[in-house]
């Protein structure tokens, strides 16, 4: 069961940031990785055995080959650890606190949910739920309030994963800011409740790197780092088609051509804050509303046919972020 904090989001002042998440990003078999791999090489993962079900779930995600490989490493470590324990060999406990870096709409929250359930199934976590928070949920208004709020969210995350979005914002106010108290409380909980919950700090790549550099004691506490690269244009078109299909809509070839132009323009305009699949979702939702208006205008007293009810035409992409 997922818990989500309901409170106003905080934003970095240097860039205009989108303010909504997308948690479901699907893939097709031809998806390609968006950027060269760095710390973890893509590999062919097994499609049989105990891993098969997790592989099937990861296969539904577009791209993210580097991330998927790292998820498999975690699984392999735990699986072999169980084998070592059964053989009477030493099987030391591992730390699974993580850093997720990347732009919005690249699947960070979705992967966090999968990891929470994976760690529960392997005996690391007792519940496997995900609790999402941000700065406004953790930081209070007076001395002591922040620690109280932060401890309450940690309590809710026990047995699962605490996912702190835009974690870098906790350090934006300097030494006197209450965000530092939230960081200190999180670090203390990592020590006091070792192996009782997993902490994931997530945010934009550059901001997260600066955040870790400004807190010398933090990097060593997060041995697992995942970078979520922006999707390629082709991958975003695949995501759009799959999102539409899930809702029983069809994007016509001309519609896909126009959408591709929109994606390219948006990516060029927002080099450091492109919202990836979130942008696709927002465009699709606006197009569906436009289609509904168009059909009512065309059939004031009749009923459109089945195909007409499904088709999203190029003109349905009008009035979407300045596009006509």
Where do the language-model regions lie?
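Pre-Walker A (pre-P-loop) alpha-helix and adjacent loop at the N terminus of AAA/AAA+ ATPase modules
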Residues: 53-96
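Walker A/P-loop
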Residues: 89-128, 152-155, 222
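Flexible beta-alpha connector loops of hexameric P-loop NTPases
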Residues: 135-146, 169-180, 225-227
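Conserved nucleotide-sensing/catalytic segment adjacent to the nucleotide-binding pocket
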Residues: 154-174
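Conserved catalytic/switch belt of AAA+ P-loop NTPases
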Residues: 168-200, 213-217
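A short helix-turn-beta junction within AAA+ P-loop NTPase domains corresponding to the substrate/partner-engaging
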Residues: 213-229
